[in-house]
Amino acid sequence: MEQVSIDTAIGQLQAVLDECFIHVNNSWTYFTDNKPDAGFIGLLQTINAEEASQNIAGTSIASHAHHVRFSLAEAAVWIRGDHAPVDWKESWRISSVNDTEWTKIREDISKSYQAVRDAMASHGSSSVEAFGGAAGVVAHMAFHLGAIRQKIALMRQT
């Protein structure tokens, strides 16, 4: 049985993370629809600040987006080896946004996604914790992508 190298494993984690955030123009996908707005970057562009601020099934899209931004920033730090305690309650403190805040969250998500991707490349194989953090952030982001997609679907039903 052929074994996968750690570099290949990190590359695959990055590929799944890419699909979570950007449109990957392949004839196939790992888990998202194969269209430009399937990942976070494109999907969040399809709604405005007012829509993002609506409470849908207990939380807003803005809440999830802020949590994603916060989580990405912390994941990059974790993968790089800084395991200082974090106040995760802070990651849910935003529930509504204005246009400027919504633009900033989306820009920060894009930058933080790249920071996580870079941290995976530079430190993802440096320790069990780093690799676990890399795998964990992929799963975490896939969950929130699905949650936001469901909230948008519910919002558009009404």
Sequence positions of predicted segments:
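Short, contiguous alpha-helical
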Residues: M1-N25, T29-D37, I41-L44, A49-E90, ...
